[in-house]
Design a protein with these regions (language model features):
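Acidic, histidine-bearing metal-coordination/catalytic regions of metal-dependent phosphoesterases
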Residues: 18-113, 117-118, 349-376
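Residue-level marker for buried hydrophobic side chains located in beta-strands
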Residues: 111-113, 134-136, 177-178, 274, ...
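Acidic-and-aromatic substrate-binding clefts and catalytic sites of carbohydrate-active enzymes
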Residues: 117-121, 212, 280-285
């Protein structure tokens, strides 16, 4: 009898651990609008992919995919606004605890933009801003090769570690990253171009881990109720293009990327925010300054190129730089209006039918710069 009594707590404890063992969960969008959301997770053992969701812990709706896998991407519909969704995921006998995320609002939308995530700092300031969507301007990890081995293109371990660092943030806030050079560094860069490519231009690991719209290495996302379009471009280390240091897709006037962006900007939304991971002054001069001509149709551009906080302005177009590692060497834009040696992020706040504010904020929540933009 004593043996049975000792075993029962162990059995119950083991069952509880199994029921709550899935904890690497993140939310993304692969549609171009917020009508659906993708629930992503990692499981220790391969199995099916099941999401239970609803407006309460009783859930009420289920989406199941029967493929055997350890990385799971399940898209669920979002029919409601101005509320919170509850959800849990399961793979075989593995379970997650209940989690929640905010449905998109109908009055005021808050979006944060970060970059240069290699240091994994405290993001309490962003959590306190209670954002509806988290974006990046590239460099979401330090590199691939030191965790995965040189030349491994589809290894996702550094991205798993990013999710593990901020479990509550990623399971409660939709996340849409843009690409940087660090996101696809598969070999040491070295002091001169190596014999084999140092970067995976196709970004296989990034695309395997994140479910995003369009080609994933470039994407756009529309929040029509707020007349807002968000666009991620693939610009980084463009001076290395054509060498084994090349990191990004083509960007000349005949490139797929340029034609795609120009088409998006022919009938732009009232607000267009463009993200990338290259020096602003370099990007706007590409294709005989035709990129800048397209940016004139939007609201602002945001890069994570430099380790500093900055707002520049050219022909009325604001060019921002933000970095979570903002105390590095500064490379000011020739048209810089504000430059700060601060770890920072950018907060976009859009009032439905009204203006958009863009704030550069330090990680201690200090507002370094605030601008108001009207619809174009």
């Amino acid at each position: 009898m004593k043996i049975i009594l000792m075993l029962l707590p162990i059995l119950f404890s083991s069952q509880f651990i199994a029921a709550a063992e899935i904890d690497r969960i993140w939310l993304t969008h692969k549609t171009n609008d917020p009508s659906k959301i993708v629930v992503n997770w990692m499981s220790d053992e391969p199995g099916d992919s099941v999401v239970h969701f609803g407006l309460s812990v009783e859930y009420g709706e289920t989406v199941r995919i029967d493929d055997e896998t350890t990385i799971h991407h399940v898209e669920i519909p979002l029919k409601h606004r101005d509320t919170s969704y509850h959800y849990s995921v399961s793979t075989g006998e593995q379970r997650s605890a209940d989690a929640t995320f905010k449905a998109y609002p109908t009055d005021i939308l808050r979006v944060a933009v970060v970059a240069d995530w290699q240091g994994k700092p405290d993001l309490s300031a962003i959590v306190n801003d209670d954002v509806h969507l988290l974006l990046t301007a590239g460099d979401n990890i330090a590199r691939l090769w030191d965790k995965c081995g040189e030349g491994e293109k589809d290894c996702i371990k550094p991205y798993e570690e990013l999710i593990e660092e901020y479990p509550k943030l990623f399971r409660s806030t939709p996340f849409m990253p843009a690409l940087g050079n660090h996101d696809r560094e598969i070999r040491p860069r070295g002091s001169k171009p190596p014999a084999e490519s140092a970067y995976d231009v196709d970004a296989l690991a990034f695309k395997r881990f994140f479910e995003l719209p369009d080609d994933e290495w470039k994407w756009h996302f529309d929040l029509t109720e707020f007349d807002l379009r968000l666009v991620a471009l693939d610009f980084n280390h463009i001076s290395d293009f054509g060498t084994t240091w090349q990191t990004c897709h083509a960007f000349d006037e005949n490139s797929e990327q340029f034609h795609w962006y120009r088409k998006l900007m022919k009938q732009p939304h009232g607000y267009v925010v463009t993200l990338y991971n290259e020096r602003n002054a370099s990007v706007r001069n590409q294709a005989q300054k035709q990129w800048h001509e397209q940016f004139l149709r939007g609201t602002c551009c945001i890069t994570g190129f430099g380790y500093f906080a900055e707002r520049a302005e050219v022909d009325g177009v604001p060019y921002y730089n933000t970095s979570l590692s903002g105390k590095g060497n500064q490379y000011p834009d020739p048209n810089s209006k504000i430059l700060a040696d601060e770890d920072s992020y950018i907060l976009l706040t859009v009032k439905r039918g009204g203006a958009m504010s863009v704030e550069i904020k330090s990680l201690n929540s200090t507002v370094l710069d605030r601008q108001i933009y009207e619809r174009r």
